[in-house]
């Protein structure tokens, strides 16, 4: 009976280690996905900001002239 317990304990121990490693890898993958979303948001902001500045550069002088009526 004792000889059966050793292999079973070994299998249980190895299975526990395997599950632990898989869980760590899964957590690392989830962190990479979250970091990737932040990078994508930053890229969208970088592309969006110059377009907004160009539009503002064209509209702002016209709006100032219309408000002050000095143009």
From Swiss-Prot:
<comment type="similarity">
    <text>Belongs to the frog skin active peptide (FSAP) family. Brevinin subfamily.</text>
</comment>
<feature type="signal peptide">
    <location>
        <begin position="1"/>
        <end position="22"/>
    </location>
</feature>
<dbReference type="GO" id="GO:0044179">
    <property type="term" value="P:hemolysis in another organism"/>
</dbReference>
<keyword id="KW-0204">Cytolysis</keyword>
<dbReference type="GO" id="GO:0005576">
    <property type="term" value="C:extracellular region"/>
</dbReference>
<dbReference type="InterPro" id="IPR012520">
    <property type="entry name" value="Antimicrobial_frog_1"/>
</dbReference>
<keyword id="KW-0964">Secreted</keyword>
<dbReference type="Pfam" id="PF03032">
    <property type="entry name" value="FSAP_sig_propep"/>
</dbReference>
<keyword id="KW-0732">Signal</keyword>
<keyword id="KW-0878">Amphibian defense peptide</keyword>
<dbReference type="GO" id="GO:0050832">
    <property type="term" value="P:defense response to fungus"/>
</dbReference>
<keyword id="KW-0295">Fungicide</keyword>
<keyword id="KW-0165">Cleavage on pair of basic residues</keyword>
<feature type="propeptide" description="Removed in mature form">
    <location>
        <begin position="23"/>
        <end position="45"/>
    </location>
</feature>
<keyword id="KW-1015">Disulfide bond</keyword>
<keyword id="KW-0929">Antimicrobial</keyword>
<keyword id="KW-0044">Antibiotic</keyword>
<comment type="function">
    <text>Antimicrobial peptide. Active against some Gram-negative and a variety of Gram-positive bacterial strains. Active against fungus C.glabrata 090902 but not against C.albicans ATCC 10231. Shows hemolytic activity against human erythrocytes.</text>
</comment>
<dbReference type="GO" id="GO:0050830">
    <property type="term" value="P:defense response to Gram-positive bacterium"/>
</dbReference>
<dbReference type="InterPro" id="IPR004275">
    <property type="entry name" value="Frog_antimicrobial_propeptide"/>
</dbReference>
<protein>
    <recommendedName>
        <fullName>Brevinin-1SN1</fullName>
    </recommendedName>
</protein>
<keyword id="KW-0354">Hemolysis</keyword>
<dbReference type="GO" id="GO:0050829">
    <property type="term" value="P:defense response to Gram-negative bacterium"/>
</dbReference>
<dbReference type="Pfam" id="PF08018">
    <property type="entry name" value="Antimicrobial_1"/>
</dbReference>
<feature type="disulfide bond">
    <location>
        <begin position="65"/>
        <end position="71"/>
    </location>
</feature>
